[in-house]
A protein has these predicted regions:
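Single conserved hydrophobic/aromatic residue that forms the stacking wall/gate
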Residues: 1-8, 12-13
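Active-site His/Glu-centered metal-binding helix of metallohydrolases
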Residues: 12, 124, 128, 218
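Internal mixed beta-strand/loop scaffold within catalytic domains of large alpha/beta enzymes
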Residues: 16-17, 25
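Charged, cofactor-coupling segments
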Residues: 23, 27-70, 130-247
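Long, K/E/R/D-enriched contiguous segments that form extended
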Residues: 43, 53, 57-102, 108, ...
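Functionally critical, mid-to-C-terminal surface segments that flank or help form catalytic/ligand
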Residues: 84-155, 159
């Protein structure tokens, strides 16, 4: 999947396509992977600056998402509840948005109110194996999923499906993102959601921003976890991406 401009902001929704022309100043989000000879899948996402250089606004948002991505990679370990990791990523994203003046209060309050789903209306990751989205229903059978579904519905979010405790041998994606989706912003604003937490006037300057997501694949080991690909990972930092696009 590839999206740019406002379509890039909707790349958290499946089956969005764009046949538009890339424009300087826009972002290009590429979510892709490959299947090996053993039929196991991979799934990666990078967000590139079309012009070869991120604007300062884009760089600010990108580095917030990268901080959440790296924190998740450091947290994944055997027997860790994946929802705890999901919420930790939300807190880092919230702290970054607060620092930019797009949200008010504390990160904890933003997460508790469900406000982060305005900016990342999808789960942090999914299981991966012979299918790109592998065994997603496991979380629904692992414990009382109805409670999780109820919490999600109250906050107006998607349902967090990856609710099981991760075990050695599990492969999960790590894919936080921040998206500025005009239709979703307008809906939450009209319904009076997240008053005192989201600064809707400040968001007006981001309506044409699009979205940023960073995704890698992580395998859980007996003692922790490691990123698949190791030091051969796809360029990921601002400098690395600008070097690739600017060639």
């Amino acid at each position: 999947e590839i999206g740019s401009g406002l379509v890039g902001s909707e790349m958290c929704i499946r089956d969005r396509h764009s046949d538009g022309v890339l424009q300087n100043g826009r972002l290009l989000l590429c979510d892709a992977g490959a299947e090996g000879l053993s039929y196991y899948c991979s799934d990666h996402t990078r967000t590139y600056p079309v012009s070869g250089k991120f604007t300062q606004k884009q760089k600010d948002i990108y580095n917030i998402v990268l901080a959440a991505h790296d924190r998740v990679a450091a947290m994944i370990a055997p027997h860790m509840p994946y929802m705890d990791i999901h919420n930790a990523s939300y807190r880092i994203l919230a702290e970054g948005l607060i620092s930019l003046g797009l949200m008010r209060g504390t990160a904890e309050d933003a997460v508790a109110a469900g406000a982060m789903t305005l900016f990342m209306p999808h789960g942090l990751g999914h299981g991966m194996g012979l299918d790109v989205h592998d065994c997603e229903a496991i979380g629904e059978r692992s414990f009382d999923f109805s409670e999780i579904a109820e919490q999600a519905a109250k906050s107006g979010t998607c349902i967090q499906r990856s609710t099981w405790r991760i075990e050695p041998g599990t492969v999960m994606t790590d894919e936080p993102g921040i998206y500025f989706i005009p239709a979703l912003i307008d809906k939450c604003r009209a319904e009076g959601k997240y008053k005192g937490i989201v600064d809707y006037e400040a968001l007006d300057a981001y309506r044409d921003f699009g979205g940023i997501r960073i995704e890698d694949d992580i395998i859980v080991t007996e003692t922790g976890s490691r990123m698949i690909g190791g030091d051969k990972r796809i360029p990921i930092t601002v400098d690395e991406l600008e070097a690739v696009v600017g060639r």
